[in-house]
Structures are given as C-alpha cells and as structure tokens.
Curated annotation (Swiss-Prot):
Involved in peptide bond synthesis. Alleviates ribosome stalling that occurs when 3 or more consecutive Pro residues or the sequence PPG is present in a protein, possibly by augmenting the peptidyl transferase activity of the ribosome. Modification of Lys-34 is required for alleviation. HAMAP family: EF_P (MF_00141). It comes from Legionella pneumophila (strain Corby). GO terms for molecular function: translation elongation factor activity. CDD domains: S1_EF-P_repeat_1, S1_EF-P_repeat_2. The modification N6-(3,6-diaminohexanoyl)-5-hydroxylysine is found at K34. The keyword Protein biosynthesis applies. It is found in: Cytoplasm. May be beta-lysylated on the epsilon-amino group of Lys-34 by the combined action of EpmA and EpmB, and then hydroxylated on the C5 position of the same residue by EpmC (if this protein is present). Lysylation is critical for the stimulatory effect of EF-P on peptide-bond formation. The lysylation moiety may extend toward the peptidyltransferase center and stabilize the terminal 3-CCA end of the tRNA. Hydroxylation of the C5 position on Lys-34 may allow additional potential stabilizing hydrogen-bond interactions with the P-tRNA. This is Elongation factor P. GO terms for cellular component: cytoplasm. InterPro entries: Elong-fact-P_C (IPR015365), NA-bd_OB-fold (IPR012340), Rib_uL2_dom2 (IPR014722), Transl_elong_fac_P/YeiP (IPR020599), Transl_elong_KOW-like (IPR013185), Transl_elong_P/YeiP_cen (IPR001059), Transl_elong_P/YeiP_CS (IPR013852), Transl_elongation_fac_P (IPR011768). Belongs to the elongation factor P family.
Length: 189
C-alpha cells in the first residue's frame, strides 16, 4: 500500500484516516514565524460524509485508501436498494439510500455514473455532471410576466425540484448541473 507524505497531499487525494477512507477537500501548507511548519487539510470521510479539519507536522505520512472509482450503469430501484451494473463485466452492486444520498434525485434508469468502491463495497455514488431530464410539473408562463426574472420551480421526472426560466413549459427536456442543482439550458431529444 502506498504512503503519502505531507508534501504530496493535494485536493482529491484519497487517504486512510482513523481506519476510514477519506478524500482531501482542501490542503494548506502553513509556515508560522516561530515553530515547525505544518499542513492543514480538510477531509471528507467517504463512509459517513462528515467533513473534518486535521493538521499534520511536516514529514508525517498517511496510507493511501484502497478505493476505486468505477463507471457503472444504474439499472433500477426495488424500494430498498438501488441496483448498478458494470457494463463490461455485468457485475452488479446493490446500494442503500444512505450511500446514494443526494445522487438519487438525478438518476434515471440506464444512466451511467461513478461508484466509489472500498473493499469491494460501494461507499459513494457520483452522478454525471450534467443530466437531461423532463419536466413533469411547473406553472404556466404567462405572456409579459417577466418582472423580477427570477424563474419558477419545476418538478422533474426523478422528483427533483429546480428553478427554471419562465418560458420553460411542462413536458420539455432540460439540462441540469447536478453539482449545483441548477438549470443550464433546454435540451433536444
């Protein structure tokens, strides 16, 4: 297993902290006027989702987390588990809702997303950055109703609710940024 020194820490690096796989979100090298230099990192526990801040003296090391990001296709939800499949090997994984978290509102059947596996167990699901979904319910846009220009809420086919411009109607396909949960543009079929 690889070991990373504090000078090798960078954003996105996956390491083991307190016997749990973590991803480094932010890394800062601090050299105070007096005393030894240290590295302050902000990490997200991949199993629980908690974000904590830790400091390490220069020269400290952390073991790498044996995690793998695998592209998988979302198959279906049986009420209790969400089922995913590796397209090349047809290997299937069942994921609980607490692992899926917010990704559930952006997934529809046959979508390809990234599952993070640790000890061959799914611990995180990352939806694609952009998805195209149909609007199932929104208020009708009235002609000339442009004051404020803020938009209106729209319910998508997966149950997610996003703010859309006034000209968008029920039944249209839209492109949504899953990282921010925002409307990007109209989409063609």
């Amino acid at each position: 297993m690889a070991v990373y020194s504090t000078n090798e820490f960078k954003n996105g690096l996956k390491v083991m902290v307190d016997d749990a796989p973590c991803s480094i979100l932010d890394c800062e090298f601090v050299k105070p006027g007096k005393g030894q230099a240290f590295t302050r990192i902000k990490i997200r526990n991949l199993k629980t989702g908690r974000v904590v801040e830790r400091t390490f003296k220069s020269g400290d090391t952390l073991p790498s987390a044996d995690v793998a990001d695998v592209e998988m296709q979302y198959l279906y939800n049986d009420g209790e588990y969400w089922h995913f499949m590796v397209p090349d090997t047809f290997e299937q994984y069942a994921v609980t809702e607490n692992v899926l978290a917010d990704a559930a509102q952006w997934l529809k059947e046959q979508d390809v997303c990234v599952l993070t596996l640790w000890n061959n167990e799914p611990i995180q699901v990352t939806p694609p950055n952009f998805v195209i979904l149909a609007i199932t319910e929104t208020d009708p846009g009235l002609k000339g109703d442009t004051s404020g220009g803020g938009g209106k809420p729209a319910t998508l086919e997966t149950g997610a609710v996003v703010r859309v411009p006034l000209f968008v109607q029920t039944g249209e396909l839209i492109k949504v940024d899953t990282r921010k949960g925002e409307y990007v543009s109209r989409a063609k079929e």
